[in-house]
Amino acid sequence: MRHYEVVFLVHPDQSEQVSAMVERYSAIVTDGKGTIHRVEDWGRRQLAYPINKIHKAHYVMLNIECDGETLGELENTFRFNDAVIRHLVIRRDNAITEPSPLAKHDEKEGAAS
């Protein structure tokens, strides 16, 4: 099985459904005998450029380990979900479990406030 980093952007009107979406996608991975190493909810952020006249989106990142069939099923689910406006899957050499630089930065800002 290979390691992947998956980032998907959710339409801002659907932000309240993000936790249910993460559970659904996690279930797809675990049902395919994969594992989830890290889940980060980066929250609603400004987009670098508008996508379909949308200027903000809710970002979520997953680090998973699964086979190609499970990854294909996950990508199909992204493609047919209208709430997911973009997704990106990157193959990694190994599992990444420490917090991302963006999550570390958010933690520092939260502690400083």
Curated annotation (Swiss-Prot):
PANTHER family according to UniProt: MITOCHONDRIAL 28S RIBOSOMAL PROTEIN S6 (PTHR21011), SMALL RIBOSOMAL SUBUNIT PROTEIN BS6M (PTHR21011:SF1)
Bilayer-crossing regions: none
Top-level taxonomic group: Bacteria
Annotated Gene Ontology cellular component terms: cytosolic small ribosomal subunit
Matches recorded under CDD domains: bS6
One Gene Ontology MF term: structural constituent of ribosome
Keyword Ribosomal protein tagged: yes
Taxonomic path: Bacteria, Pseudomonadati, Pseudomonadota, Gammaproteobacteria, Oceanospirillales
Originating gene: rpsF
GO biological processes: translation
Keywords of this entry: Ribonucleoprotein, Ribosomal protein, RNA-binding, rRNA-binding
InterPro entries (UniProt xref): Ribosomal_bS6, Ribosomal_bS6_CS, Ribosomal_bS6_sf, Ribosomal_S6_plastid/chlpt, Transl_elong_EF1B/ribsomal_bS6
Name listed for the protein in its UniProt record: Small ribosomal subunit protein bS6
Role description: Binds together with bS18 to 16S ribosomal RNA.
Family designation: Belongs to the bacterial ribosomal protein bS6 family.
